[in-house]
Amino acid sequence: MAAARKQNTRKRRVKKNIESGIAHIRSTFNNTIVTITDTHGNALSWSSAGALGFRGSRKSTPFAAQMAAETAAKGSIEHGLKTLEVTVKGPGSGREAAIRALQAAGLEVTAIRDVTPVPHNGCRPPKRRRV
């Protein structure tokens, strides 16, 4: 009558052999999120500055973006990834640092695309800061 052992319900990660993929870099003023997917958009690995333990204003630094890109690249290299297209979205400071970190991790960057959404005079922007 001992307590029943809880079964491990977590699914094991299957190693996929994928040659090329897409790195989606979302760089805001507060954080940088790097997601590496296959060409169909299925996520292989992801990382962000906040997930690595950077908090507050340190989350928005280029160094935090570099570390996030390195962590995501390591996870995708385990799946056999070799070449990448990079799509960058947002105005943050970690854009260039994340791209350089992906190249330094051993991934070949074939294209860099800026997909930052630009409004055709849509929503009213937030009020200007007075510091």
UniProtKB/Swiss-Prot annotation:
Residue ranges the record marks as coiled coil: none
Domain of life (superkingdom): Bacteria
Residues of the signal peptide: none
SUPFAM superfamilies: Translational machinery components
GO CC annotations on file: ribonucleoprotein complex; ribosome
GO terms of biological process kind: translation
Keyword Metal-binding: no
Pfam families: Ribosomal_S11
GO molecular function: rRNA binding; structural constituent of ribosome
Keyword terms, alphabetized: Ribonucleoprotein, Ribosomal protein, RNA-binding, rRNA-binding
Gene3D superfamilies: Ribosomal protein S11
Membership in a protein family: Belongs to the universal ribosomal protein uS11 family.
UniProt subunit comment: Part of the 30S ribosomal subunit. Interacts with proteins S7 and S18. Binds to IF-3.
Function: Located on the platform of the 30S subunit, it bridges several disparate RNA helices of the 16S rRNA. Forms part of the Shine-Dalgarno cleft in the 70S ribosome.
Record's protein name: Small ribosomal subunit protein uS11
Organism: Bacillus velezensis (strain DSM 23117 / BGSC 10A6 / LMG 26770 / FZB42) (Bacillus amyloliquefaciens subsp. plantarum)
